[in-house]
């Protein structure tokens, strides 16, 4: 399971800038809920072969009670779940009393902690760091999140702080295909999970997962083994804030990271709302197989049903490859139909695409709809081969291949999807321009070619 890094500090010390630097502004998820979860950002970051989640806990503001309720409400859950804490301070403004108070609060968390001095560009590092040693948090890392200076050293330090999780994803004692049920509050996730497990009779007790209280619940459906991945953690519910209990984004991210296929549950009564779009985007970025379950479909008026279908097409065009099921988790209608789509998504995500068949499909696609002309020359796509699975990755080589437009990219993805029947999974395309080994080199003629050219010149002059 991927580790979690929490960014903590007072306002305007550069937490959001560092967040965007680490995540490259991808996978960012803003949960707009009143109270404890307002404007908390979550994202996935990569460094080398290491992946980890990042959470920006928001600024800690000074109040009469010191850190007070705002700090505990906004950051407590993220810090409790975090494996590592980055405590950001402002190198321009220097040490403040609020910094000292936050440092004392963080020490009580008893988590790996790294002091990060931001906004240090153009300043003497030793001089900037000197006053922060009094915090007693060890050697600080000096960075400029805006310019990227020192971020590499910070990430190297992070690798030494990341714990060895009790069991990695590959070590979870799970049976069969692993899938997760994801959705915003009150869409019927728990009802759907209970319906699935209640109907299929859980074969064994909950298997303890990693330090995140994740559980893997094996069961059998029509003679086939599955494992439901759940990171909600029954034990956690008794010790977290009520509002946070309803919707913890990091739990959803962890579920997505572990699962092979994700079921996105949408409430038919509300149709597609912003939180649905956020979660759908996170699932898409993860590259996992996906199935959409529109819950509470029973009893919905015909006019409202049509409106929901229209919203699905209009607001989720980037998940056009996902099978959509209209279900009632409460009454069980349509729940059994989810399993063929789960299987299909998994098989598609792990498909082996023979090179010969890929090239024939590429040739047919290009003949049907040639690539556009760029700078007076038509793009030539010459050959393709598979570059990975889960999701399927297709590498296409050609001339000016990097100039392929987004529209033509979508056309090729849809063509490959139809040609190979890849439903329930995204498809990744990578274009590589074939390098011309003679580009930039003078065309030097051999002696024989030079003599031939002279004869042609004399011949043309003789005709004139």
Curated annotation (Swiss-Prot):
Annotated binding of GTP 2, by residue: 183-190, 230-234, 295-298
Start and end residues of each EngA-type G domain: 3-166, 177-350
Pfam families, per the entry: KH_dom-like (PF14714), MMR_HSR1 (PF01926)
PROSITE patterns linked to this entry: G_ENGA
The keyword Signal appears for this protein: no
GO biological process terms held by the UniProt record: ribosome biogenesis
Domain KH-like: 351-435
Entry similarity comment: Belongs to the TRAFAC class TrmE-Era-EngA-EngB-Septin-like GTPase superfamily. EngA (Der) GTPase family.
Function description: GTPase that plays an essential role in the late steps of ribosome biogenesis.
Protein name: GTPase Der
Lineage, broadest ranks: Bacteria, Pseudomonadati, Pseudomonadota, Gammaproteobacteria, Chromatiales
Gene that encodes the chain: der
């Amino acid at each position: 399971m991927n580790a979690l890094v929490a960014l903590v500090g007072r306002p305007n010390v550069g937490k959001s800038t560092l967040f965007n630097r680490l995540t490259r502004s991808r996978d960012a998820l803003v949960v707009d809920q009143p109270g404890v979860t307002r404007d908390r950002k979550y994202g996935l970051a990569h460094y080398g072969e290491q992946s980890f989640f990042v959470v920006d806990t928001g600024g800690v503001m000074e109040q009469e009670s010191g850190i007070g309720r705002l700090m505990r409400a906004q950051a407590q859950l993220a810090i409790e779940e975090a494996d590592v804490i980055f405590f950001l301070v402002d190198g321009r403004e220097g040490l403040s009393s609020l910094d000292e108070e936050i440092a004392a609060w963080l020490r009580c968390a008893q988590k790996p902690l790294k002091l990060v001095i931001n906004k240090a560009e153009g300043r003497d590092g030793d001089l900037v760091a000197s006053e922060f040693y009094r915090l007693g948090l060890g050697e600080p890392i000096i960075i400029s999140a805006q310019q990227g200076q020192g971020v590499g050293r910070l990430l190297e330090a992070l690798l030494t702080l990341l714990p060895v999780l009790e069991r990695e994803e590959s070590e979870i004692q799970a049976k069969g295909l692993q899938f997760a049920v994801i959705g915003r509050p009150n869409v019927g996730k728990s009802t759907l999970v209970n319906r699935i497990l209640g109907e299929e009779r859980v074969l064994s007790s909950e298997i303890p997962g990693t330090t995140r209280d994740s559980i893997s619940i094996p069961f059998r459906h029509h003679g086939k083994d599955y494992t439901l991945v759940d990171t909600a953690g029954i034990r956690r519910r008794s010790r977290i804030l009520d509002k946070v209990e309803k919707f913890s984004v990091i739990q959803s991210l962890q579920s997505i990271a572990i699962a092979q296929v994700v079921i996105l549950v949408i409430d038919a009564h509300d149709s597609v709302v912003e939180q649905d779009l956020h979660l759908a985007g996170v699932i898409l970025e993860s590259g996992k197989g996906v199935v959409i379950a529109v819950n509470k479909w029973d009893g919905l008026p015909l006019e409202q049903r049509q409106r929901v279908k229209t919203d699905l097409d209009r607001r989720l065009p980037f998940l056009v490859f996902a099978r959509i099921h209209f279900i009632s988790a409460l009454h069980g209608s349509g729940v059994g139909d989810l399993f063929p789509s789960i299987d299909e998504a998994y098989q598609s995500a792990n498909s082996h695409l023979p090179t010969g068949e890929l090239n024939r499909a590429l040739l047919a696609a290009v003949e049907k709809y040639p690539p556009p002309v760029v700078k007076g020359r038509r793009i030539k796509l010459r050959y393709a081969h598979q570059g990975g699975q889960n999701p399927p990755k297709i590498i296409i080589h050609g001339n000016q291949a990097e100039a392929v437009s987004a529209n033509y990219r979508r056309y090729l993805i849809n063509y490959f999807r139809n040609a190979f029947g890849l439903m329930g999974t995204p498809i990744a395309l990578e274009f590589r321009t074939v390098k011309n080994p003679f580009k930039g080199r003078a065309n030097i003629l051999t002696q024989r070619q030079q003599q031939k050219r002279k004869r042609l010149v004399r011949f043309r002059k003789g005709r004139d």
